[in-house]
From Swiss-Prot:
Residues 1-75, 291-314, 715-737, 1373-1405, 1801-1876 are annotated as: Disordered. This is Mediator of RNA polymerase II transcription subunit 12. GO terms for molecular function: transcription coactivator activity. GO terms for biological process: positive regulation of transcription by RNA polymerase II. SMART domains: Med12. Residues 1867-1876 have a biased composition (Basic residues). Component of the SRB8-11 complex. The SRB8-11 complex is a regulatory module of the Mediator complex which is itself involved in regulation of basal and activated RNA polymerase II-dependent transcription. The SRB8-11 complex may be involved in the transcriptional repression of a subset of genes regulated by Mediator. It may inhibit the association of the Mediator complex with RNA polymerase II to form the holoenzyme complex. One of its GO terms (cellular component) is mediator complex. Its main location: nucleus.
């Protein structure tokens, strides 16, 4: 380099004269001002090249001097040349060639240019931070009109206009949405008239407008073509302008601070963006072919270019992608949506290409502006995040993708606070089901996947947000579904852990807040306690309700599952005393006359058998693997193990019954149980004990021996005489029983049947009853006479083969068939013992031997005898015998009908599954032999059994009749077919009659054909017969019979329709429904005679009897619609007196024939087979799914025979008789006891549909038949609480709840003059029955509230419950005050807890509850029972907020809660540590305080304006309890429960009261420090504020993101949004007094806003002066600052923007001028931090000349490796260097060179006990900030320094680090290589 420099000098010397001449000329012109002499000095900012370089040395410049080596002209120098001395010792050659080659490269100039640009930019970056304080001047404000304001914004949008000119003044009053809209438009806002023109102008260069737009008008086209398209303000200039506006506002308004300006800017921006989102609304439009498909999406997102260069392309692409998605599903066309609506939903903005591009560009500009404002801390995070969450929650399907992008950008902020994450989680649970319902997965575009992913992120990162009672109450189904989806997608171990977390952690805590018992607690002790706490009245009511339901699943759950499923082998199950009361209830229910039906005895016997052996009751109508007949096998009980000995209970119950029967009525009237047992029917006892004996539960032999031992079998003379005089040994009525002087046991001994007993037992029985009698006994004579009558009544069963064959040929019995009641009088007068022995020894063997010769009617006649004798065991044996063999069609129909008709008996006997399987075998057999008729009957039987067993509707989907064009066309075809069908029907009827009249044994040529051939003539009327033609034939046949009024055509029509039914498909019910509905219309529209109606009803009756027509279908589509229309004309005053023929009498006659079997009539109307068919069909009408239709028909009949009806008196009597018999029948009584509320509602709804009908009177008439003791039969004014309580005895409790609903509704519907009296009556009645109805029988109270349709009545009951609860709480607290040391006694012995009470919370709760028993716990038990009752009552409202109006009682309860919490805090103030833990557990689990609070929070009337102080006290008390629990390590469970309660309170507080509590809450949260960081984080999530400012550790300041990321040019520290380096004065250094003030909203302005003084705290904004080193500004820097031009002199370099950048974006970047400086006392600006959470450490600021001083916290939770990773990183530039060494601090130089300094970590010391502990190192700073030292509780080891420059093999000598006084000794083996 020297040689090239000399050559240049010599070459320049050749041009010396010219050079001197130019110097002379320059001296002449500049003689007055000579230039300064050049000084060879480097600039002050340039670091030296090398530590050994001269002070004034300039690189590559060597001036001549005397004695220099180049002047040596010796011989050696001349011969060998000059060898220059190397400037650096390790440089051995010249760099001229390398430099010359580099300069000759093609890109040399570009490279040099880039280097110079970087140099200039770097100097500008460094000089920007050195602007003097007096140069920060805010601009002045001016008020501009609209035109000038538009011009100002236009200039702002023009990049060529310098900001210097715009900065001279700032518009005043320019704010709101108008500000952002003008920034977007880039000038004046377009008016309404020119809005379209502006849009066209803007997109003129991009989009070709439609042809109509160009030809609209000449002026418009001219203006559009001449006006230039507007351009939005660039994002950097827009941010500068907004900041300038805020700075001007701060400087002009004294009372305004950044805390108010920033939220205002944020609110305006959110409102502006909300208007844009609102443009994407969905509009319903008519579907058309031209718009059926969606608008085409853009080809690629690249067509939508950003309007400003600063718009981020990534955000724009996301917006375009979202827009592309939002276009397609917004149409919701049939191709992409399952909706069948004729209209579609479209978004007009996205349907138009121009509007779409305008909206997307504007939205992209909004997002870019929002991001930059947020980066500059010009937006309030809390306001912004809250708006985004609210907008996301209220968005539709089109808006959802755009708001989803916003949510993803602020998701981390959302997860930080519960006030954001809870509404966001609620929004997800609403939006995901909405997307599922509106969009299919193929068209959702991954939207649902994104939503589910967000749900998963929320659940994983903020699991505490799941603990929300309202969330689980309102969105339980969606939440459970999504959690199950997440578990399915997660691998098995992780999914199992997630499932356990939800079930074991989340659900118990949520159930605690909802006051629900957690289902997961299934321990034995808990179940025993539950059974012990179940009151006897409630258990009695539940047992009777289960028995009345006749639902085997319910009976199994109430009686068997509690004892056999979970604790099958518990001692409690084998305790006979526990079951004594329940067995007594079962026996009484089975035999009392307060219930009806022999089925009760069979159900009770089966249930007692299962209880005795401890087996569950399993019932199913589905197919089983094999056929088993356990009910017919009497040996199966011998293999079972007895668990309960029920025989002593039976004997005791029989004794009580006998005592009750022998007492007088007046004596037993005062005793409830005695009066109840007096209603027991002895005949029912005989059936029950006989069934128990057959099942092996009751031993007849032991019973007989017991009676013989007690001498109760010796007959008296009077009794023997009485036997001959009155041979009725069965004694079927209570009156005859009481007339007998024999004991009940002796009568039972005579009547009980014997099943498969040996002859010795019969002989012993004869000896016990008749003694030594050798003659024929009374029973033998009765059996002989009854057998003779039975053979006479059933000759086909006992006759010879010829006679049986003759009886089989008969189609129907002769009209002179005797009445079975009179024909078998001897049989009915005999005892049950005689009847059962006669059936099993004579009847059943004879029938079984001749079963092939029987027909359906004969089988039905035999079954009628067995049913009248209540011998269902014999009938079951007969059915099993029949179904086990192939049957004829006639016999199979009768057998199937008996299976359906007595299905309830078979279910009670637990043989339904066996019979069901036998029917299924018949179906398989008939299908295999292609017997279609029998297969159809078997399949129909299985479907009807499923309806009866499982309450599943049968396969009927009959649609309403549509009187449209299709119906009219079909009717025209039917009318056209009538003549031909009439002729064919007459011919077929004539053939049928001739075949019947002729002898059956002689084949007649006139006999009609069978099968499909009979339909051939009818089908020949059509060219191509099909299903529609069959329907026309069927309808024409029915119309012909109806129009011709000829009953002789009915048999032929039945045969034809039956054949059509047999050949029809599964849609036969729909076909029948159509022509039945057509019949109703034709009857209503025309006048038909009674003969026609009777012929039609006869046809329908025969079709029902034949099984062709479904009675349920006929009721729904014909009978009920016709009755409703007829009765409406009767009740309507306008049509009541019109002369319209009514056929109600004919319908009632047909219904009487159909319901004869169900009403208990023994004389058949037509035949026994028809009775069985009608009975099977009517049984379906009494099923729960079909019962409303039957009750509606009964309601119509009641209205028809009412006093105001115009029906003739003769018909009224007939209708009333049938209706009363129907409502009093056994099936109706059973159905009414099953669902009393369903019956009342069906009657009431029917009455409401008929104008002029009185619902109350109709209900009273119906209840007189259903329940003669009903309260509704009394006057409402006479009903008091005592009468209601008398009915609440368990037997009528469910009915009472239904009656009370009707009573309260009637009290509300009184006249206005009696309204006050009715209200008083309602209140008195509700108050009087509240305890009995809601406390003792909570299920009935809950049912009452559930059935009430009046919200006012529900709120009244709720108010009464709250008042009673408040009174009991007050009484309990008064009793507790009498014993002030109650709490001290309650927690004695509770001081020895484990490390964490969260793992043993149930045990501690039980301990606390046991300890509380030392005090007066009676009041607390009453409070608890009342509380549970109120909760159960309120939960029936099906809303999270309970409807109530008693605000005073609610306030009293809340005041009690707050007082209890404050008392608990006071008692814990002076207690010891263990005492505090015990008291805390007692407050949580040993009292009702928190349960009361959780209940009161759900009342809607609780909060009002007067509750501010009480709400604040509640929050403070809960927060203090939470703090105390969090500070104790062993109180983890208590802390979680208290945190849940506090969160619950904050969630339910209204905004007006929440604003009162927030200041105190935020203040306490800033000062609370808990035991663990995890608890602190959980508690901090309750805060409602987001820190808008950032700490110096996490943020940097740079001119742009590119400068920071690419060049690494930035300054550490947060950005003050109002510290505008261009116009605001720089704030001074913070003082210690101001260091503690926190700026929560981003920056808190000081007293002098003009000077820009900002007070910052540990989480506030850190100004630039606060992070600069005290020695950063030197003398040379000051001179440089003074030499720079000011803000008013036009320096343009200062107009670069400040941008705050998170440090995480930079990563770890090490450059020459930016060296990562880890915290160390050796560094000039270093700090020592022991935790990553900088916001949780106390900050200590020194004097004005000091840098930031940061205190440290304990590092006991981190080991050495974690502590090293926890050290924060700071980046220092040349401006902040302290002591320099070659341009960088010595510490940074050593770190770069590889000198590894061990950080100051906590050292391990040993205490006196020998345990190892950790003591943290702390960095302290004196007030002057002169030096920093490290102090610790123990002496540290010296830090070892490894110098990689030491190459000697020997050991490195000890040296002292210049800034780190640490000595290190090491060898070469420990040196790091370059790779390391």
């Amino acid at each position: 380099m020297l040689r090239s420099g000399a050559a240049s000098a010599s070459s320049g010397g050749g041009r010396g004269p010219s050079s001197s001449l130019s110097s002379v000329k320059r001296s002449k012109h500049d003689d007055t001002r000579l230039p300064e002499a050049y000084q060879q000095e480097r600039p002050p900012w340039r670091p030296p090249l090398h530590p050994t370089a001269a002070r004034r040395h300039v690189p590559d410049l060597f001036p001549t001097k005397s004695g220099q080596p180049e002047d040596d002209m010796s011989q050696i120098s001349v011969r060998k040349g000059f060898a220059p001395r190397t400037y650096v010792h390790n440089e051995y050659f010249c760099a001229h060639d390398a430099i010359h080659t580099r300069l000759l490269s093609p890109d040399a100039l570009d490279t040099l240019s880039d280097w110079m640009d970087e140099v200039m930019q770097r100097r500008r970056e460094l000089d920007r931070a050195s602007i003097a304080t007096n140069q920060y001047k805010p601009p002045s404000r001016v008020t501009l009109n609209d035109a000038k304001l538009a011009n100002y914004v236009k200039d702002l949008a023009d990049p060529t206009v310098p900001l210097m000119r715009l900065s001279r003044s700032v518009p005043h009053g320019f704010r709101g949405e108008k500000l952002f809209e003008m920034l977007w438009v880039g000038g004046a806002l377009p008016s309404t008239a020119t809005a379209a023109t502006t849009t066209v102008n803007y997109f003129h260069s991009r989009i070709a407008g439609p042809p109509s737009a160009s030809s609209a008008s000449a002026s418009a086209s001219a203006s559009a073509s001449t006006s230039a398209p507007r351009k939005s303000v660039d994002i950097p200039r827009a941010v500068w302008f907004i900041r300038a506006l805020g700075a001007a506002e701060l400087s002009s308004l004294r009372n305004k601070s950044a805390a108010t300006i920033i939220p205002e800017i944020t609110s305006n921006l959110c409102a502006w963006m909300a208007k844009q989102v609102a443009e994407l609304n969905l509009v319903h439009t008519a579907e058309s072919n031209s718009t059926a498909t969606a608008s085409p999406a853009p080809v690629s997102p690249s067509t939508h270019l950003p309007r400003t260069p600063s718009a981020a392309p990534s955000s724009l692409s996301r917006s375009v992608a979202a827009a592309h998605f939002a276009r397609t599903p917004s149409n919701l066309n049939p191709a992409s949506s399952p909706s069948l609506a004729p209209a579609k939903e479209v978004c007009y903005v996205l349907q138009n290409d121009a509007d779409e591009e305008r909206w997307i560009a504007k939205w992209s500009y909004s997002l870019s502006l929002a991001r930059h404002l947020h980066a500059q801390n010009l937006l309030d995070r809390s306001v912004l995040v809250r708006w985004i969450v609210d907008a996301f929650s209220a968005s539709n399907l089109v808006q959802l993708p755009f708001l989803l992008e916003l949510v993803q950008e602020v998701l981390l902020l959302v997860l930080r606070r519960r006030c954001f994450v809870k509404p966001f989680l609620t929004a997800l649970l609403v939006q995901i089901p909405n997307v599922d319902a509106r969009l299919d997965p193929s068209s959702s575009g991954g939207l649902r996947t994104k939503l589910v992913l967000l749900f998963r992120i929320v659940c994983e990162n903020s699991p505490e947000s799941l603990i929300s009672p309202r969330l689980w109450f309102e969105h339980s189904a969606s939440l459970t579904q999504l959690l199950n989806e997440l578990n399915a997608e997660t691998p098995l171990p992780l999914s199992h852990q997630a499932f356990e977390f939800v079930e074991q952690t989340v659900r118990p805590r949520v159930d605690r807040l909802l006051l629900r018992p957690h289902s997961g607690n299934t321990t034995q002790n808990a179940s025993l306690e539950t059974q012990e706490t179940l009151s006897s009245p409630l258990q009695h009511h539940l047992d009777i309700q289960a028995l009345d339901s006749f639902d085997m699943t319910t009976i199994d759950r109430v009686f068997l599952q509690n004892t056999s499923a979970t604790h099958r082998y518990a001692k409690h199950d084998r305790d006979d005393t526990v079951w004594a009361t329940r067995i007594d209830t079962i026996l009484t229910w089975a035999c009392t006359d307060r219930r009806s039906g022999v089925v009760r005895q069979y159900l009770a016997a089966t249930l007692i058998e299962k209880i005795r052996f401890g087996v569950p009751w399993e019932e199913s109508s589905e197919e089983t693997d094999q056929v088993s007949l356990p009910a017919f096998d009497l040996e199966h009980n011998t293999t079972k193990t007895r668990k309960i000995n029920v025989e002593p209970m039976l004997i005791k119950w029989l004794g009580d019954v006998e005592t009750s029967l022998n007492q007088k009525l007046d004596e037993s009237s005062t005793q409830t149980r005695v009066s109840l047992l007096a209603t027991v029917d002895v005949g029912a006892i005989v059936v029950l004990l006989g069934e128990l004996a057959r099942r092996g539960v009751f031993s007849y032999t032991k019973y007989l021996q017991r009676l013989i031992a007690r001498g109760m079998t010796a007959p008296s003379a009077s009794s023997a005489t009485e036997q001959h005089q009155n041979p009725d040994g069965s004694v079927q009525t209570p009156s005859s029983v009481s007339a007998s002087r024999d004991s009940l046991h002796l009568r039972l001994l005579r009547s009980l049947p014997l099943y498969d007993q040996p002859a010795s037992v019969y002989q012993q029985r004869r000896q016990a009853i008749y003694g030594d009698r050798t003659k024929e006994t009374y029973e033998d004579a009765a059996q002989r006479r009854a057998l003779r009558q039975l053979q006479s009544f059933l000759p086909f069963a006992f006759a010879q083969e010829v006679q049986a064959e003759a009886s089989r040929i008969a189609v129907s019995p002769s009209p002179s068939t005797p009445d079975p009641v009179h024909a078998l009088s001897r049989l009915w007068s005999a005892s049950r013992f005689v009847r059962c022995r006669l059936f099993r020894s004579e009847l059943l063997p004879a029938v079984t031997a001749r079963v092939e010769r029987l027909n359906g009617d004969q089988l039905s006649q035999i079954s009628a005898v067995l049913v009248m004798a209540d011998d269902f065991e014999g009938l079951a044996q007969l059915l099993a015998t029949l179904l086990l063999r192939p049957l004829s069609d006639n016999l199979a129909r009768a057998a199937f009908n008996m299976v359906i008709e007595y299905s309830l008996v078979w279910r009670s006997m637990d043989i339904m599954a066996t019979l069901n399987q036998l029917v299924r075998q018949q179906l398989n057999h008939s299908s295999s032999i292609r017997n279609d008729r029998q297969a159809v009957m078997a399949s129909t039987t299985l479907l009807r059994l499923r309806t009866l067993i499982e309450n599943v509707p049968s396969r009927i989907s009959a649609s309403a009749l549509d009187p449209g064009a299709d119906h009219d066309a079909l009717q025209q075809h039917v009318q056209a077919l009538r003549p031909n069908v009439d002729a064919l029907l007459d011919r077929f009827a004539k053939l049928t009659r001739s075949s019947v009249e002729s002898d059956g044994s002689i084949a007649s040529s006139s006999t009609p054909v069978e099968g499909s051939d009979m339909l051939t003539p009818f089908r020949s009327l059509f060219v191509q017969p099909d299903a529609m033609s069959d329907e026309m034939i069927e309808r024409t046949i029915v119309d012909s019979v109806f129009a011709r009024s000829d009953t002789s055509l009915v048999p032929s029509a039945v045969r034809l329709i039956d054949q059509l039914y047999l050949e029809a498909s599964l849609e036969i019910d729909e076909r029948h429904a159509r022509w039945l509905s057509n019949l109703v219309l034709s009857i209503e529209q025309g006048t038909h005679s009674d003969a026609s109606m009777k012929a039609l009803l006869s046809l329908l009756t025969r079709l029902i009897a034949h099984g062709t027509l479904n009675l349920q279908l006929a009721m729904d589509t014909f009978l009920l619609p016709y009755l409703l229309s007829s009765v409406r004309r009767l009740t309507d005053p306008a049509t009541r007196n019109t002369e319209v023929p009514m056929h109600i009498g004919s319908i009632v006659s047909s219904l009487g024939e159909i319901f004869a079997s169900s009403l208990g009539e023994t004389v058949p109307a037509t035949s026994y087979e028809d009775m069985r068919a009608f009975g099977a069909q009517t049984k379906l009408l009494f099923a729960q799914v079909n019962l409303p239709s039957l009750l509606r028909a009964a309601t119509c009949l009641i209205s028809a025979f009412d006093e105001t009806s115009t029906v003739p008196a003769s018909e009224k009597a007939q209708i009333e008789s049938f209706c009363n018999a129907l409502l009093q029948s056994q099936p109706m009584q059973i159905a009414f006891r099953q669902e009393p509320r369903l019956c009342i509602l069906a009657i009431k709804d029917t009455c409401k549909s008929m104008w002029g009908c009185n619902p109350s009177r109709v209900i009273d008439l119906a209840m007189a038949c259903l329940d003669p003791t009903s309260l509704l039969l009394r006057d409402v004014g006479t009903i008091d609480a005592a009468s209601v309580k008398n009915r609440l005895d368990g037997w009528d409790t469910a009915v009472v709840a239904t009656e009370l609903v009707e009573i309260f509704e009637r009290l509300q519907l009184v006249e206005s003059s009696f309204q006050t009296r009715a209200d008083s009556k309602t209140k008195a009645l509700a108050s009087g029955i509240f305890d009995d109805l809601f406390v003792q029988l909570p299920d009935i109270g809950a049912q009452l509230v559930r059935d009430c349709q009046s919200s006012g009545l529900v709120s009244r009951f709720t108010d009464i419950g709250i008042k009673i609860l408040s009174d009991k709480v007050k009484a309990a607290s008064t009793d507790a005050d009498k014993t002030p040391r109650r709490m001290d006694n309650s927690h004695k012995g509770m001081t020895n807890f484990g490390p964490d009470d969260g793992a043993d919370a149930p045990a501690q709760a039980k301990t606390a509850a046991d300890a509380a028993k030392h005090g007066p716990c009676v009041g607390e038990q009453q409070v608890e029972s009342t509380l549970r009752s109120v909760v159960r009552m309120c939960e029936q409202q099906h809303s999270f907020i309970f409807n109530a109006t008693d605000a005073d009682s609610c306030a009293q309860l809340l005041l009690h809660v707050v007082t209890s919490l404050e008392d608990a805090l006071g008692s814990m103030a002076a207690a010891s540590h263990q005492d505090k833990v015990a008291r805390l557990v007692t407050v949580l689990h040993g009292s009702m305080t928190f349960q009361l609070m959780h209940l009161v929070l759900r009342f809607g009337c609780l909060w009002n304006g007067t509750m501010r102080a009480l709400a604040l006290r509640l929050v403070k008390a809960l927060l203090e309890l939470t703090r105390q629990a969090g500070e104790k390590t062993e109180c983890g469970g208590s802390f979680a429960l208290l945190l849940d309660s506090l969160s619950f309170v904050l969630d339910e507080l209204p905004p007006t009261l929440l604003s009162t509590c927030l200041p105190e809450l935020e203040t306490q949260l800033q000062t609370i420090e808990l035991a663990t960081q995890e608890r602190s984080d959980k508690l901090q999530q309750l805060s409602f504020r987001l820190d808008n400012a950032t700490t110096a550790n996490a943020w940097l300041v740079a001119s742009s993101a590119g400068a920071a990321l690419k060049k690494g040019w930035f300054t550490s520290g947060g950005l003050n949004p109002w510290e505008c380096a261009e116009y605001l004065e720089a704030p001074p250094a913070a003082n210690p007094a101001a260091a503690g003030a926190a700026g929560a909203a981003g920056a808190a302005a000081g007293g002098n806003a003009r000077a820009g003084v900002v007070e910052t705290g540990r989480s506030g904004v850190n100004s630039r002066a606060a992070v600069e080193s005290p020695g950063a500004v030197t003398v040379n820097d000051a001179e440089t600052c003074n030499s720079l031009p000011g803000a008013r002199t036009g320096w343009t370099g200062k107009l670069w923007l400040n941008t705050a950048i998170p440090l995480s974006m930079l990563g770890v970047r090490v450059t020459r001028d930016l060296v990562p400086n880890y915290a160390s006392p050796a560094s000039p600006g270093g700090v020592s931090v022991g935790s990553n959470d900088a916001s949780s450490q106390p900050w200590t600021t020194g004097g004005g000349a000091s840098a930031i001083g940061v205190g440290t916290c304990s590092a006991m939770d981190m080991d050495a490796k974690e502590a090293l990773a926890a050290l924060p990183m700071f980046v220092e530039s040349e401006r902040t260097y302290g002591e320099r060494s070659a341009g960088e601090p010595a510490y940074s130089r050593d770190l770069r060179r590889g000198l590894l300094v061990e950080p100051n970590l906590p050292c391990r010391t040993r205490d006196e006990r020998g345990e190892t502990s950790q003591e943290p190192a702390r960095a302290t700073m004196d007030p002057a900030g002169a030096h920093t030292s490290v102090t610790s509780s123990a002496t540290h080891d010296p830090s070892h320094v490894i110098d990689l420059t030491w190459d000697a093999d020997e050991e490195m000598p000890l040296s002292t680090h210049p800034h780190h006084p640490a000595v290190a000794t090491t060898s070469r083996k420990r040196r790091l290589s370059k790779r390391d």
